[in-house]
Amino acid sequence: MTTILAIETSCDETGVGIARLDADGAVTLLADEVASSVDEHVRFGGVVPEIASRAHLEALGPTMRRALSAAGVTKPDVVAATIGPGLAGALLVGVAAAKAYSAAWGVPFYAVNHLGGHLAADVYQHGPLPECVALLVSGGHTHLLQVRSLGDPIVELGSTVDDAAGEAYDKVARLLGLGYPGGRVLDELARTGDREAIVFPRGMTGPRDAPYAFSFSGLKTAVARYLESHPDAVNADVAAGFQEAVADVLTRKAVRAATDLGVTTLLIAGGVAANSRLRELAEQRCAAAGLTLRIPRPGLCTDNGAMIASFAAHLVAAGAPPSPLDVPTDPGLPVVKAQVS
């Protein structure tokens, strides 16, 4: 049995998760503590890196103590941290702390990929992950991935050529005067609207477009132009039409990728995976295509330390070597690089 403590500080959530890796490879969540600084960013309409970094400094100690207490652990066997991608200053806070704990406790340190953590979060709810296609959708990332196992190299099938899906949500939420963060509020508003009242364009869906690539910049512009030309537009209908366009493209391409590759499982992960319409449409299309759909509960979709602990546990189980304590953070770490060693 191996106990893994993991720190997540890539953006505005300070997360500490603790997981247990059993001899049979099973991963069990022991603690998941998160402190968010989102309220400090609201008046700026987005995350301010300096504020996020200072908030991590203040929150990490108390969050660590709560996690250790909840798990009943005094000293883990492994310490892990998000090494990238993310905000440079925010990453430094978590990685520096993790390295210090690793050295003080005399245990191995694993520098792991934040995006891989999103994929690994689902294991807590649905068990070991089979070979699958993964749709990873978050505030700054939109990727289609081929995942053979969480301990094997990840293959990128496609990604966004401009805005990520989560970025589009935040930008359209601002256009509608919904404030920041906009994803959840826009989702709630869209549920009260008519998603067929306004049909917005679906980017990168033409016969000559890359089948697994995404584009949401044009959709955002289309919403802005619609609002300019329709000053009396019903915001709920605009939100519903926008959300339908995003969910349609994401699920259509994800199901196609799984079908093309002959895999039977589709995993959807990342913050946008908490979106109600995306989950609903994915369920419908996976059922029609004979695919098994896996989506973590909403609390596991957003940033947290538990997902980093899970991913680190799978790397340990696969025999990956620890990372050196002088390994640098990598704010632009690509999704296909699971670990920095």
Curated annotation (Swiss-Prot):
Disulfide partners: none
Positions with a binding annotation for substrate: 136-140, 170, 183, 187, 275
Enzyme kind, highest EC tier: transferase
Binding of Fe cation, residues: 114, 118, 303
Entry EC no(s): 2.3.1.234
Cofactor (UniProt): Fe(2+)
Reaction equations catalysed: L-threonylcarbamoyladenylate + adenosine(37) in tRNA = N(6)-L-threonylcarbamoyladenosine(37) in tRNA + AMP + H(+)
This protein's UniProt keywords: Acyltransferase, Cytoplasm, Iron, Metal-binding, Transferase, tRNA processing
Gene Ontology MF annotations: iron ion binding; N(6)-L-threonylcarbamoyladenine synthase activity
Protein's cellular compartments: Cytoplasm
GO CC annotation, single: cytoplasm
One BP term from GO: tRNA threonylcarbamoyladenosine modification
Cofactor: binding comment: Binds 1 Fe(2+) ion per subunit.
Gene3D superfamilies: 3.30.420.40
A Pfam family recorded for this sequence: TsaD
UniProt function note: Required for the formation of a threonylcarbamoyl group on adenosine at position 37 (t(6)A37) in tRNAs that read codons beginning with adenine. Is involved in the transfer of the threonylcarbamoyl moiety of threonylcarbamoyl-AMP (TC-AMP) to the N6 group of A37, together with TsaE and TsaB. TsaD likely plays a direct catalytic role in this reaction.
Sequence similarity: Belongs to the KAE1 / TsaD family.
Protein name: tRNA N6-adenosine threonylcarbamoyltransferase
Gene source species: Mycolicibacterium paratuberculosis (strain ATCC BAA-968 / K-10)
Gene: tsaD
